[in-house]
Amino acid sequence: MDVQRLLSTAAWVVGGIVTYELVRSAFVSRLARRMDRAGSDYVSSRNIRLDRYKFASRSYVKQEVLNSPDLAKAIDASAAEQGKPVEKIRADVDSWLDEIVPAFNTWAFYRFGFSIARLALNFAFEVIIDRRALERVQKKIPSDAAVVYVFNHRSNADFIIASYALASSIAISYAVGEWARVWPLDSLFRRFGAYFVRRGFRNPLYHLVLSRYVQLIVRRGVSQGVFPEGGLTRDGALREPKLGILEYVASLKADPTFQKDVVFVPVGINYDRVLEDTSLIAEAKGGGSLGKDTLASRLATGWAILRKMPSMLVVNSLRAAA
């Protein structure tokens, strides 16, 4: 009798779990479809151009990168050099690609991210965007060209401002560092179309993988945003450029199979006052430092926005020129 009761209870528990999973799966699938439809409707109603390759599955993009002939040779060479099995090196490459490749979602970018950015930026700043100059430049760009928007780097808020300013015409993809590889930021940034990079990681094979990914999305027409300074300016003057990603893009022109134009659009972001002003002044006087670009520094920037909202007026002028 006890055995029968135990079996009956177990059957009810299993049945309950199965029912819950079926209902949950159906609900999640329906919600995902509704969110995708809402994002697509938003983009269509505003005639926003989205790069098709952004919607390719992550597994497909990863496989395209892995299909690079020189990458396969480099994996074999790295295994021989390190005395490790080829499978171990391939596993490392797969892990890096998992970090790098995004999973763009229109609802996440336009209905969630854009709405939050608009609320925060317009509440904190007076945002001035030279849309005429931007539209004038974009009209001159060939429809099949690969476009790279090149920004100066004045503040930790630049990433938000750049995406917000261009969102009415294009959703750009750009690299983000290790600071964003924490939950839930990693999932959010992937859905915003950002790809993750390991700054300061010296492994040559990793940089080959990253370069092949960047070159792949350029070949497929994905519009990118690049901050060549690689870090905030300390005094308002442009820093010496770090040409990593720009070099990956420019080197494609040496490939005879690549026939597209690559258009670099310089975009200026200027402030009356940056969020990090107090820290920058202290650093200039030798009494402090902004330190490395970390999640903590980004959170500090967010706190600065909240703390200064009642009194700070910032004019951001974004201008583009061919």
Stretches with model-predicted labels:
Residues 2-148, 155-161, 186-187, 191-193, ...:
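Membrane-anchoring hydrophobic helices of lipid-metabolizing enzymes
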Residues 142, 167, 219:
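Short conserved AdoMet
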Residues 143-151, 222-224, 228-229:
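Pre-Walker A (Motif I) flank of P-loop NTPase domains
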Residues 153-157, 231-233:
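Gly/Ser/Thr-rich loops at beta-strand to alpha-helix junctions
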Residues 158-173:
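Classical protein tyrosine phosphatase
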Residues 172, 177-194, 202-322:
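A cross-family acyltransferase "interaction/gating" segment
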Residues 197:
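Hydrophobic residues at beta-strand termini and immediately following loops
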